[in-house]
Amino acid sequence: MDSSFAQRLAVCSWSLQPSDPADLVQQLQSIGINRVQIALDPIREHPQVWNKIVELFRQSNITIVSGMFGTLGEDYTTMESIRRTGGVVPDATWDLNWRNIQTNAVLARQLDLTLVTFHAGFLPHEEDALEFKKMLDRILRITDRFGDKGIHLGFETGQETAEDLRAFLTRLNRPNLGVNFDPANMVLYDKGDPIEALRTLGPWLKQCHLKDAIRTQKPGNWGREVVLGTGEVDWRRFFGTLAEMKFTGDLCIEREAGTRRTADIRVARQFIASLT
């Protein structure tokens, strides 16, 4: 494996569920990675807690590689519930989500970020459907708002096949819009082979999330997230494919399950190092 991959590792801040910037710094230091993808929503919602983050990170030699924002009202109870409530699809939460997104764009610019990622929600596939036009309009508004500030956006992957996402990205046709590729999500959502999906979406690749999963045995149900290196993602093929593609972006370790996330991310770092 290309040794530069280890130098481009980062940690997703929300995986660590930090109470404040000092807690985040302490956990990053215990993991042994000083690069982070930062969740923007806590900073926007609790500025009195997070307003010293830039200064503290500078003192601690921690680099923010990118940002992430979420959307209100998401229900991950079942595959069907997240299809209805995920991302910017629901009309009931759109106005408030749009206000929050605009504020997050300002915040991202203040943090000198060049990339922000998000879950758009399940994308419609029929171009003549009203839902397609609605989603196209909303995504273009979001993309252009960040683009006006010199910021790229990355779709989180997994909620549709790579071919469907490629078609939507082609239709959107925005140079600052691409993909934050997560191989485990392709497994969790049962949307095809992660490596083939990576090849399909390669031209739009902005960043990768690194986590692992086991595919469901019951179609329509979730797969199961597991510690990186213990699931079904073929990591040697994954990193080999990135090397073939000459990918130079960041690789952010994410852990969204379990009660030992700091330890699990440390294991992930060690596993990735063992592949070199």
What is each stretch, according to the model?
Residues 13-21, 39-51, 73-75, 123-128, ...:
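Acidic-and-aromatic substrate-binding clefts and catalytic sites of carbohydrate-active enzymes
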